[in-house]
From Swiss-Prot:
<dbReference type="InterPro" id="IPR041095">
    <property type="entry name" value="EFG_II"/>
</dbReference>
<feature type="binding site">
    <location>
        <begin position="148"/>
        <end position="151"/>
    </location>
    <ligand>
        <name>GTP</name>
    </ligand>
</feature>
<dbReference type="InterPro" id="IPR009000">
    <property type="entry name" value="Transl_B-barrel_sf"/>
</dbReference>
<keyword id="KW-0648">Protein biosynthesis</keyword>
<dbReference type="GO" id="GO:0003746">
    <property type="term" value="F:translation elongation factor activity"/>
</dbReference>
<feature type="binding site">
    <location>
        <begin position="28"/>
        <end position="35"/>
    </location>
    <ligand>
        <name>GTP</name>
    </ligand>
</feature>
<feature type="domain" description="tr-type G">
    <location>
        <begin position="19"/>
        <end position="260"/>
    </location>
</feature>
<dbReference type="InterPro" id="IPR000640">
    <property type="entry name" value="EFG_V-like"/>
</dbReference>
<feature type="modified residue" description="Diphthamide">
    <location>
        <position position="598"/>
    </location>
</feature>
<dbReference type="Pfam" id="PF14492">
    <property type="entry name" value="EFG_III"/>
</dbReference>
<dbReference type="InterPro" id="IPR000795">
    <property type="entry name" value="T_Tr_GTP-bd_dom"/>
</dbReference>
<comment type="similarity">
    <text>Belongs to the TRAFAC class translation factor GTPase superfamily. Classic translation factor GTPase family. EF-G/EF-2 subfamily.</text>
</comment>
<dbReference type="Pfam" id="PF00009">
    <property type="entry name" value="GTP_EFTU"/>
</dbReference>
<keyword id="KW-0963">Cytoplasm</keyword>
<dbReference type="InterPro" id="IPR014721">
    <property type="entry name" value="Ribsml_uS5_D2-typ_fold_subgr"/>
</dbReference>
<dbReference type="GO" id="GO:0005829">
    <property type="term" value="C:cytosol"/>
</dbReference>
<feature type="binding site">
    <location>
        <begin position="94"/>
        <end position="98"/>
    </location>
    <ligand>
        <name>GTP</name>
    </ligand>
</feature>
Amino acid sequence: MGRKEDNIAKAMKLIEIPERIRNIDIAAHIDHGKTTLSDNLIAGAGMMSEDLAGKQLLLDYDEQEQARGITINAANASMVHEVDGKEYLINLIDTPGHVDFGGDVTRAMRAVDGTIIVVDSVEGVMPQTETVVRQALKEKVKPVLFINKVDRLINELKLNAEEMQKRFVKIITDVNRLITKYAPPEFSKQWQVNVQAGTVAFGSAYNNWALSVPAMNIFKISFKEIYDYVSTGRQKELAKKAPLHKVVLDMVIKNLPNPREAQKYRIPQIWKGDLDSEIGKAMLSCDDNGPVSMMVTKIIIDPHAGEIAVGRLFSGIIRKGSELYVSGAGKTKVQVLSMMVGPDRIPIDEIAAGNIVAIIGLKGAIAGSTVSSLSDMEPFEPMTHYTDPVVTLAIEAKHTADLPKLIDVLRTISKADPSIQVDINQETGEHLISGMGELHLEVTIYRIKNDYKVDVVTSEPLVVYRETVDKKGGPFEGKSPNKHNRFYFQVEPLPENVVSAILDGKIPEGSKFKDKKAVMANLEEAGLTHDEARGLVCIYGTNVMLDMTKGIQYLDETMELLIESFNEAMDKGPLANEKVYGLKVSLMDAKLHEDSIHRGPAQVIPAGRNSIYGAMCEAGRVLLEPMQKVFISVPQEIMGSVTNELQQRRGVVEDMQQNGEEITIIAKVPVAGMIGFASAIRSATGGKVIWNSENAGYQRVPYEMQKDVVAKIRERKGLKPEPYNEEYYASL
C-alpha cells in the first residue's frame, strides 16, 4: 500500500473524531504563493509526489489555471498529519487571490474554521490581503500567518539577518492592524498573530522550508543560520532540517480550532434560526446524532459525474442513499458521497458532522444552498461577497442548433459560480453574462468553448452602470391607466451609511422581515429619521421603500403591488434601464378606487412605477459607473509610460510609494477605462510591470459625458437614445 493510499485509510478513521479535524483555507493576494504552499503541504503529508510539488500545482488542476499560473477556483484536498503522537485530518481549500475571482474566496470561508494568511515578504500586505482578512474575520474564521518568499529578502534585496527580522515585524504589525480593524470585538485581541505564541511562520514554499519560533527551538536553528543556508544556496539542506509541511501543519493543529470548538461561536454568526431548537443545539455542538445540516459552498461540474455539491456538514451524519431537502429545490437522494483529494474523489459510505464533503445527487443545489434532513430548516445566512459584477458580455451561439445547449450551459455555469450573473433572453437569442472583471469573463467563455464544446460569439465587454439621483424630487403623481388610482412618490439619495449597512449585510433585503424592529433600529442608527424607519416597507438592492402616509383606505391591500412597482423601477431606472443604486423612495399619499376590481396589478403597478420615474426625473438623474483601484509596480525609468496610459483611461493617480528600485502607483480608474488595459500596459512597459486591481464602488459619470454614454446604452438595448422626461410620465 503506497503512502497516499495509507493516508487515505487513516483519513477514513479520523472523519469520525471532530477533535482531530481542522478545516482550513489558504488566502492571500495574487501571486503571494498560496497554491505552491498548498501543493507542498499536500506532498509533505504524503498525498502527492514531493518532486512534483510546487511545479505540479496539484490544486490548480484546471487547464486554464495552469496556463495562466493563477488559481481561479477554490480547490479542496484532505490530508493526514501527526503531532505529538496523534494523527489529525486537515481539510484544506486553496482560494484564488485575483480580484475577479473573489466570490470563490467568500464561499470557501463559509466552509472553514481557520485560515493561513500568506504574505510575500518582499511585497508585504497588499489590497487583496486586506480583502481576504476582512472576509475571514466576518465569517469568524481564525487566522495564522505565513510569511513567504523569505529567500528573496536575502538573495534579491540582500538584507542581513537583523534587517530580515525588522521586515517580519512590519508585516506582523500590518496584519495585526487588519485583525484589530475587522475582527469581532470578542476576538480582536485574542486572535492577534504573535511570533512567540507560534501563530507566525516564515519560509519559502517553493524551496520547501519553513520555521517558526517554536520550530527554531526544536530544530536548534538561529536567524543567522537561516541567512547562511539561503545565501550560500543550501536551501535543499534547510528543507531537510526544517520541512515546510511539518512547521506549517504543526502551527495549524496547535493554533486553529477544531469544528466542535469553532461551531460554538460561528453558528450564531452564519445561521439566524432558533439556537434552542433541536437543529440549533446540534449545530452548536457539532453533534453527529442531530438532524443533518449542511451548507453547499461550491458546485463542481464534472463531465462524467455531472454536478457535484461540495459543502460543510455542521450536524448529523449523511449516508449514501440519505433523503435530504435542498432549500428552494425540494427533496433529493444522495447517490455518491466522497472526500476530495485535489482532483481525486475518494468514495465513502457515510460522513459525520464537522467535515467537508462532496455529494452527487443533490438536485437543484447551488452554491449557498442549505441542505437538511428537515423539510423546514431555516436556511443559512446568504454569503455576501463584497462586489457586484461590473463587466458584461453579450453572448450567442455561433450555430443556431446549439442555442438550447447554450442556455443549459449558461444556467449550469451560474450555478457553479454565483458571482456570474446570466440574463437569458429567449426571444432575441442574445444572452448577457456579467462577471467581476474582464479576466473572469474570459475564463468563463473559454470554459463554455472547451469544457462544454459550444461555439459562441461574444460582443466587446460592456460596463455595468447604475442610476441614482442628485437631490430630492416629487411627490410626483402617477395615474393608473383607468385613471381611478393615483400615487404620490418622493425620491432622494439614501444616506451613505444606510447603503454601506445594506452592502455589509447588517440590514437585510426583502419585505418580510423576521425581526422588523431590529431592522428599523439599524436603519435609524444608520441615518434615517425615527418616522422614516417606522415606515419601512421593503429593501431591494441598495434601495429602500418607505410608507409615509397616514390612514389611507385600501392601501394595505394594494401594498404588495406597490412593492412590485418599486422593484421594477429599481431593476430598470428611467435613464438607461440600468439598476438603481442608493435611493430612498417614500410613498407620501395615495387615492384609491373603493372597488378592488379597479385596482388590480395592471392598474397599480404602472401607476406606482411612473410616479417613481417622474420623481426621479425631477430629482436630477445621475449615471454611476463602477471604479477600480489599480496597484501597479514598475521600475522607476518607465513610470512615465504607465502614468500616461492611466491618464488616457481617465485614471487619477492617488499615491506613489517607492520600494527600492520599484515604484508602486496607486490609481482610481473607471472600469470602462480598464477594458483592454492588461495588453496595453504590457506593450507600453515591455512586460516589466506587475499590476492588480480591486473594485472600488461607484462614481458619477462626468457630467459632460453622461448624455453620450446614456444614448449608447439605450441604443444597445433597442430604446430611443433620449430618455423620457417628467412631462412624459405626467401625461400617462
